[in-house]
């Protein structure tokens, strides 16, 4: 789902 993708993108930024 788009929501999940957004979370993954955020996680990468945090990392």
From Swiss-Prot:
Contains 3 disulfide bonds. Binds 1 zinc ion per subunit. Its cofactor is Zn(2+). Signal peptide: none annotated. Keywords: Calcium, Disulfide bond, Hemostasis impairing toxin, Hydrolase, Metal-binding, Metalloprotease, Protease, Secreted, Toxin, Zinc. GO terms for biological process: proteolysis. Expressed by the venom gland. Its EC number is 3.4.24.-. GO terms for molecular function: metal ion binding; metallopeptidase activity; toxin activity. Its main location: secreted. GO terms for cellular component: extracellular region. It is found in: Secreted. Monomer. Belongs to the venom metalloproteinase (M12B) family. P-I subfamily. Snake venom metalloproteinase that impairs hemostasis in the envenomed animal. This is Snake venom metalloproteinase Bco22. It comes from Bothrops cotiara (Cotiara). The lineage of its organism: Eukaryota, Metazoa, Chordata, Craniata, Vertebrata.
């Amino acid at each position: 789902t788009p929501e999940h993708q957004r979370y993954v993108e955020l996680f990468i930024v945090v990392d």
